[in-house]
Amino acid sequence: MDRYAAAGDEAADRARQQERHYQLLSALQSLVKELPSSFQQRLSYTTLSDLALALLDGTVFEIVQGLLEIQHLTEKSLYNQRLRLQNEHRVLRQTLRQKHLEAQQSCRPHNLPVLQAAQQRELEAMEHRIREEQQAMDRKIVLELDRKVADQQSTLEKAGVAGFYVTTNPQELTLQMNLLELIRKLQQRSCQVGKAAL
């Protein structure tokens, strides 16, 4: 008798899973209509169905939320690093301007052209160094963000999310961003439905 009850429970679970899959797939198909037509064409029924299957247990929603939080923290940290560098450069410029002004005020008039030429060279050298430091910082930021994207792609691929794999192809990246946006919108909808049920 217990075997029959267990079989009935399994059948009911499968039916609930199938219903949930259908709801997710239907919601995804509805959301896809909001995307540009070029991306709508690339999101086949199979891709959307596979995505809906990956979303069934809610784990992918949690993974995406975690990745989003990590990304925001990373972006904030990188922004703060660049801001610190800009502030250091601002202080360097102010200090050099002050030093030059004091030197000019204490300089004899006949030596002023020589001093100003030397100061101009010093200023140009400092500006060159500042540009190089800013470019190095920008390259570091781009590399860090690229690394973060690859980590996200790898994590979502390992989680079995359709359409995700490590790539640098701009079209594929845009498609993956659209898929993430679909997942995020679905998550927001389910949160709103959950709140409405309360």
Curated annotation (Swiss-Prot):
Classify the source by domain of life: Eukaryota
What the entry lists under InterPro entries is as follows: Gonadal
Which keywords fit this entry according to its UniProt record?
Answer: Coiled coil
Tissue specificity annotation: Expressed in all the examined tissues with highest expression in testis.
This molecule's function is given as: May have a role in early embryogenesis.
Give the UniProt family note. Belongs to the gonadal family.
The name this protein carries in UniProt is Protein DGCR6
What species is given as this protein's source? Mus musculus (Mouse)
